[in-house]
Curated annotation (Swiss-Prot):
Glycosylation-annotated residues: 145, 161, 178, 321
Disulfide bond positions: none
Induction: Unlike other major royal jelly proteins, not down-regulated by the ecdysteroid 20-hydroxyecdysone (ecdysterone or 20E).
UniProt note on tissues of expression: Found in and secreted from the hypopharyngeal glands of the worker honey bee (at protein level); expression peaks at 12 days post eclosion. Expressed in the brains of adult worker bees peaking at 12 days post eclosion (at protein level). Expressed in the spermatheca of adult queen bees (at protein level); Expression levels are higher in mated queens than in virgin queens.
Record protein name field: Major royal jelly protein 7
Protein family according to the UniProt entry: Belongs to the major royal jelly protein family.
Task performed by this protein: Component of royal jelly, a substance produced in the hypopharyngeal gland containing proteins, free amino acids, fatty acids, sugars and other nutrients, which is fed to developing larvae by worker nurse bees. All larvae are fed some royal jelly (also known as worker jelly) early in their development but it forms the principal source of nutrition for larvae destined to become queen bees. Produced in the spermatheca of adult queen bees, along with other major royal jelly proteins, where it may act as a nutrient supply for sperm stored by mated queens, or be involved in energy metabolism.
InterPro entries recorded: 6-blade_b-propeller_TolB-like, Royal_jelly/protein_yellow
Signal peptide: 1-17
Source species: Apis mellifera
GO CC annotation terms, alphabetical: extracellular region
UniProt gene name: Mrjp7
Keywords, ordered alphabetically: Glycoprotein, Secreted, Signal
Highest taxon in the source lineage: Eukaryota
Main localization (coarse): secreted
Amino acid sequence: MTRWLFMVACLGIACQGAILRENSARNLKNSLKVMHEWKYIDYDFGSEEKRQAAIQSDEYDHTKNYPFDVDQWRDKTFVTVLRYDGVPSSLNVISEKTGNGGRLLQPYPDWSWTKYKDCSGIVSAYSIAIDKFDRLWVLDSGLVNNTQPMCFPKLLVFDLNSSQLIKQVDIPHEIAVNTTTEQGRLKSLAVQAISSVNTLVYIADNKGDGLIVYQNSDDSFHRLTSNTFNYDPRYTKMTVEGESFTVQDGIYGMALSPMTNNLYYSPLASRDLYYVNTKPFIKSEYGENKVQYNGVQDVFNTQTTAKAVSKNGILFFGLVNNTAVGCWNEHQTLQRENTDMVAQNEETLQMIVGMKIKQLLPHIVIIDIDNIINDEYMLVLTNRMQKILNNDLNFNDINFRILIGGVSDLLENTRCTNFNIQNDDSDENNDDSIRITIDASFN
């Protein structure tokens, strides 16, 4: 058993956990620890009577609820659930209550936002992102059952301090779909918050082979095309733990580097990694002579899914066939020899669909014997998508998980270690810091 230090610090309204590995040996199987797990997704309906009524009316069917993205802010952990018939709420937080399937979800901001048939609420929250101004950005695809258009796709922005809607913007049809093929499904989201006004949002259309740029300052949209967005017919078949499925999806998972302003992305049905520098978009320059797409084909030995970039420029990505999290240091040449794995587990890492890199709150530090460490941590959501698509989920098994791990621990002794960039965020003289260490053991 590996001994970990588990720290929880509270400031009345906020509690946050962080995990720090004590030894330096690489243990890929246990480098990410399970934070939450579910056999099936269930909700806090307020009472068992209301839950049974939701079941009887087909509002809730536990076999149709599949988590898709995760993020965290203070004491709130957000989970999105794709809107299928039988899904009562698409945007949720994890409650303190536990049901037979696992922790119960609560709709966010409240149940009124779950009413979607008149398009006033949230239809299907595919992806979410929280920026440095405490805003939650929500990409609502407007789709039911993953294919049926119910409403226009839209962006919603919530003030997390008040849980109030700040802005809602419908995405025009000619932006949301490929007007040549009339195909479109908006899936991945990345937010670049330069200021509270000057904020750009990048949205991937993985069926219409497009990248959409939204500028918050003037509510403008721009749709970009590139052959780097297209899926590769050679890699449409994916296999997870011996179970195969086929997809023809373009961009799946994007991540923005805070160091280089590179937006990294990969078509799901590919083994490629591409990037585009976002500085032209910041200047509202979208011409072909201004925007350059770069990358390497077949740089991975399998398809990749969700992505995230650390503050020091380490790109993390889900590796499908490997049931693993990989890494690459953007300060190194983009080639397979410079990639590595930081976590691998055949049971817990089946289809990584959500990934976030989070900063510890400024008033929270981890104390490890003689050292005070401020660090980033990673959140990973897995949902066994292969079984969802093949309709063979066993709801007596654990199917969905959120895992957590410290970034510096994950990177230790890997090819992705950044030797030239030091973490200067620690402040041992910060009298306002709360320093609480609780020993905990994990099997």
